[in-house]
Regions:
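Subset of outer-membrane beta-barrel
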Residues: 57-62, 174-206, 268
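Conserved small-residue
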Residues: 38, 55-169
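Exposed, low-structure sequence patches enriched in small/polar residues
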Residues: 108-109, 123, 180-182, 193, ...
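C-terminal extracellular loops and terminal segments
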Residues: 40, 44, 86-101, 168-180, ...
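Flexible, solvent-exposed coil segments and beta strand-coil junctions
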Residues: 25-35, 155-162, 232-245
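Extracellular/periplasmic, surface-exposed regions of secreted and cell-surface proteins
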Residues: 1-105, 246-277
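Extracytoplasmic gating/loop element in the C-terminal half of outer-membrane beta-barrel translocons
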Residues: 197-277
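Active/binding-pocket-proximal capping segment
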Residues: 15-20, 28-30, 196-200, 207-211
């Protein structure tokens, strides 16, 4: 503590290794089933947690104190089954966090008469076939039309397949912070808490137009694609995602988590009312 106990806190660093995790893993279907529960895998967590407490103002009748918290954690899969292979079914990848989004990368929205270069391939709209074709006449992205999500060809073969999926981001934040304040004035207490989450990748349900239904998503105010509004930010309302892919966004946000106002009734008033503490 410092400044006559007006400032205090602590810093914790940690490294945690966990092995023999009970997880469901896939096995060849020839066994009669395709998954079993097994003690497999190793993970490593490391991070830092910081807490600071301060007395900002203190007089006879007034006190204002604050508490600040910061937490950063990094986890990764060290080993799965001991063979060095990833588990695509469960979306587990060696060297990556346990909870990740694994999907196609959306580069934008297909436009009418679209034509672009990617990984040495030329992709263009064929009006006769109503398809986007590569230079060999192969369909680049099955079912794609103007207003569809434009997916990235990651492996460079000139067409979209399951091999083009990638790790989009972590489901857990890069770091979190919170700031709490408590103000006391005589018998009154007022407190509030802010929470902050930074660097988390979220699935954007608002972009999944095929799921629009009463009470779920609404199109009001959404800048969706139409021939008259050829936006590159959102697909058309009739778009059905290829291979059930979805949309993601890396987010940071701060929220007011809690507000409390309290009053401590003096014992003298309680006694007059016949109430004992």
């Amino acid at each position: 503590s410092f400044l006559n106990n007006r400032l205090s806190g602590n810093i914790d660093f940690y490294v945690s290794n966990t092995s023999d995790l009970l997880m469901k893993r896939t096995v060849p279907i020839m066994n009669g089933y395709n998954s079993i529960m097994d003690n497999v895998g190793k993970t490593r967590n490391k991070g830092v947690e910081i807490t600071l407490n301060s007395v900002n103002v203190e007089t006879k009748d007034f006190r204002w104190g604050s508490t600040f918290n910061f937490a950063l954690n990094r986890d990764k899969i060290v080993e799965l089954r001991g063979d060095g292979n990833d588990d695509l079914t469960n979306k587990w990848f060696i060297g990556e966090p346990v909870k990740v989004h694994y999907d196609y990368n959306v580069m934008g929205t297909w436009q009418e008469n679209d034509r672009f270069e990617l990984n040495g391939h030329t992709i263009a709209w064929d009006a006769a076939q109503k398809k986007y074709l590569n230079e060999d006449g192969e369909e680049y992205q099955k079912g794609a039309a103007p207003g569809s999500a434009k997916l990235e060809d990651r492996d460079g073969d000139g067409k979209i397949t399951a091999k083009d999926k990638m790790i989009i981001g972590s489901k857990l934040p890069s770091f979190t912070m919170s700031l709490g304040n408590t103000i006391n004035y005589k018998d009154f207490t007022f407190s509030f808490l802010f929470n902050g989450v930074f660097g988390v990748t979220k699935e954007m349900q608002d972009y999944n137009f095929e799921r629009w239904s009463l009470g779920y998503n609404y199109i009001d105010g959404m800048d969706y694609w139409t021939p008259e509004n050829p936006t590159n930010e959102m697909t058309s309302p009739g778009y059905v995602p290829y291979d059930k892919h979805t949309f993601y966004k890396k987010m940071n946000y701060v929220q007011l988590k809690n507000i409390t106002l309290g009053y401590n009734i003096p014992q003298s008033l309680l006694s007059k009312a016949g109430i004992a503490a």
